From Swiss-Prot:
<dbReference type="InterPro" id="IPR022645">
    <property type="entry name" value="SecD/SecF_bac"/>
</dbReference>
<feature type="transmembrane region" description="Helical">
    <location>
        <begin position="246"/>
        <end position="266"/>
    </location>
</feature>
<feature type="transmembrane region" description="Helical">
    <location>
        <begin position="225"/>
        <end position="245"/>
    </location>
</feature>
<comment type="function">
    <text>Part of the Sec protein translocase complex. Interacts with the SecYEG preprotein conducting channel. SecDF uses the proton motive force (PMF) to complete protein translocation after the ATP-dependent function of SecA.</text>
</comment>
<dbReference type="GO" id="GO:0015450">
    <property type="term" value="F:protein-transporting ATPase activity"/>
</dbReference>
<keyword id="KW-0653">Protein transport</keyword>
<dbReference type="GO" id="GO:0065002">
    <property type="term" value="P:intracellular protein transmembrane transport"/>
</dbReference>
<keyword id="KW-1133">Transmembrane helix</keyword>
<dbReference type="InterPro" id="IPR022646">
    <property type="entry name" value="SecD/SecF_CS"/>
</dbReference>
<dbReference type="Pfam" id="PF07549">
    <property type="entry name" value="Sec_GG"/>
</dbReference>
<dbReference type="InterPro" id="IPR048634">
    <property type="entry name" value="SecD_SecF_C"/>
</dbReference>
<dbReference type="InterPro" id="IPR022813">
    <property type="entry name" value="SecD/SecF_arch_bac"/>
</dbReference>
<keyword id="KW-0813">Transport</keyword>
<dbReference type="Pfam" id="PF02355">
    <property type="entry name" value="SecD_SecF_C"/>
</dbReference>
<keyword id="KW-0811">Translocation</keyword>
<dbReference type="GO" id="GO:0043952">
    <property type="term" value="P:protein transport by the Sec complex"/>
</dbReference>
<comment type="similarity">
    <text>Belongs to the SecD/SecF family. SecF subfamily.</text>
</comment>
Length: 404
C-alpha cells in the first residue's frame, strides 16, 4: 500500500527550515530544564519513583472524584500530592503519591493514617473504620468485648474470625465493605452485632502502602540515564558495523535530538518523569532508529545504482521513495498511542504522552536530521559533485572509501 507515488520533494533544499525548527524546540526544552535545575536542583520534574516518597493505593466503593480527593488532601495539609486513577474504569482505584523523606515503619503508618483521616468526609463519631483496619486490631477488639463468651483460648478463636473478616473484605469485596451487615452469614451474628457498636464502613479502603526511599530513587535515576546512554551507544556500534561510522553518528544524533525535545516537552508541560516515561523514551529511541535505518538502507542501495548523481540528489530521492512507508507506519503507530493517551487513564498518561511526542519527532528526525547529516558530512570533508558516501556492501571491493 502506498500513500504517495512518485513524490519529488526537495527535502535538502529545506534543511535550514528544519534546522531552525529543531533548534527552537531543542533550545526551548534546554532553557526550561536549565531554569528548573537552577530553581529546584533537578532539570525535569521527577516522580516518586526517582525522588522518593510514599505510594498509597486506595480502593473506592463508588467512582472516585479526583478533584474532591485533591481538595481533601489540601485541607489536611498534604503537600502537592500526585493523584491518579489506575486499573480499569470499573475498578474505582486511585494511587496517591506523597513526598516523604522518612522511610521508617512509623512514617509509613503516619502517612497512611493521614490519608485515611483526610478521605473520611463523614466519619461516625468515636467509631473505627472496618475498611481500614487489620486482623490484629479486629482480634483485639473482639477479645475485649468477648461477644461469644469464649472460655477456652479466646485469642485463637477471635484471630480466626478476624482473619475471616479481612479475607472476605479484601478477596471477595475488593477491599471495601458497604456496611458491617455484609458480614452476616460469614461470621457469627453476635460478632457482627458487637462490631456494629464500635465500627462503621467508609466508602474506601487503603489496599497497600509502599515507600520509595531517596537512595533508591537516586539509584533508579542513574540506572535510567545509563540505560539511555547504553542503548544509544549500542546502536552506534551496530550501525558502525552495518553501515559506515557516519551513519551511526547521524542516527544517534537524531535519537539524541528526539530525546532532548521529548524530555524538554515534559519540563515545559511540568509533567513528571517516571519509570514508565523512561520506558517510553527507550521505546521511541528504538522506533526512531528503526525509521532511520529504513531511509539509510534505501540511500545505500541508491548509492550503488546511481553512482553518477550527487549524494544530495541520492538522499532526496531515497527519502521520497521511503516517504509513503514512513508516514503509513508512523501514522498508524501515532493513532494507537494517541488512543492510549486519550483513553488509557492517568497511570499511562505520561507513557503515552512521551510516545505521542516521540513518534512525531522521531519521524521528522529520520527525514530532516539523520539523512541530511550524510550530505553535511561529505560537504564538510570537501567531497562534492558525484563523489558518493560509501554504503556497506557485503561483497568484496563494493565499497568506496571517503578519503580524508
Amino acid at each position: 500500500m502506498e500513500l504517495f507515488r512518485n513524490t519529488n520533494i526537495d527535502f535538502l533544499g529545506k534543511k535550514w527550515y528544519f534546522l531552525a525548527f529543531s533548534l527552537v524546540f531543542s533550545v526551548a526544552g534546554l532553557i526550561s530544564m536549565g531554569a528548573r535545575y537552577a530553581k529546584t536542583g533537578t532539570a525535569v520534574p521527577l516522580g516518586v519513583d526517582f525522588k522518593g516518597g510514599t505510594l498509597v493505593y486506595v480502593k473506592f466503593a463508588q467512582t472516585p472524584n479526583l478533584g474532591d480527593i485533591r481538595a481533601a488532601m489540601d485541607r489536611s495539609g498534604l503537600k502537592d500530592p500526585k493523584i491518579q486513577t489506575y486499573g480499569g474504569p470499573a475498578n474505582n482505584e486511585v494511587l496517591i503519591a506523597l513526598e516523604q523523606k522518612e522511610t521508617s515503619e512509623q512514617a509509613l503508618d503516619a502517612g497512611k493514617n493521614t490519608i485515611i483521616k483526610a478521605l473520611e468526609t463523614n466519619p461516625a463519631s468515636g467509631k473505627n473504620d472496618l475498611n481500614n483496619v487489620g486482623s490484629t486490631t479486629i482480634r483485639d477488639y473482639l477479645m475485649s468485648k468477648d461477644p461469644l463468651h469464649e472460655v477456652v483460648d479466646p485469642g485463637a478463636k477471635y484471630q480466626q474470625i478476624a482473619s475471616q473478616i479481612v479475607d472476605y473484605r479484601d478477596k471477595e469485596r475488593g477491599g471495601v465493605l458497604s456496611s458491617v451487615d455484609e458480614l452476616q452469614g460469614h461470621v457469627p451474628a453476635d460478632v457482627v452485632n458487637a462490631l456494629k457498636t464500635d465500627y462503621f464502613t467508609s466508602g474506601f479502603g487503603v489496599r497497600n502502602v509502599e515507600i520509595v526511599g531517596p537512595q533508591v530513587g537516586k539509584q533508579l535515576s542513574n540506572q535510567a540515564l545509563l540505560a539511555t546512554l547504553y542503548s544509544l551507544g549500542g546502536m552506534l556500534v551496530y550501525l558502525w558495523f552495518r553501515f559506515e561510522l557516519i551513519y551511526g553518528i547521524g542516527a544517534v544524533v537524531a535519537c539524541f535530538h528526539d530525546t532532548i525535545i521529548t524530555v524538554g516537552a515534559f519540563s515545559l508541560l511540568n509533567r513528571d518523569i517516571s519509570l514508565t516515561v523512561v520506558a517510553a523514551i527507550l521505546t521511541l529511541i528504538g522506533y526512531s532508529m528503526n525509521d532511520t535505518i529504513v531511509v539509510y538502507d534505501r540511500i545505500r542501495e541508491n548509492i550503488k545504482l546511481l553512482r553518477r548523481e550527487s549524494l544530495a540528489d541520492i538522499v532526496n530521492k531515497s527519502i521520497n521513495q521511503t516517504l509513503s512507508r514512513t508516514i503509513l507506519t508512523s501514522g498508524l503507530t501515532f493513532l494507537t498511542v494517541l488512543s492510549l493517551y486519550v483513553f488509557g487513564g492517568e497511570v499511562l498518561r505520561g507513557f503515552s504522552l512521551a510516545l505521542v511526542i516521540g513518534i512525531l519527532i522521531g519521524t521528522y528526525s529520520s527525514i530532516a536530521v539523520a539523512a541530511p547529516m550524510l550530505v553535511a558530512y561529505q560537504e564538510w570533508r570537501g567531497h562534492r559533485g558525484t563523489a558518493a558516501l560509501p554504503g556497506p556492501a557485503p561483497r568484496k571491493n563494493d565499497r568506496v572509501k571517503v578519503k580524508a
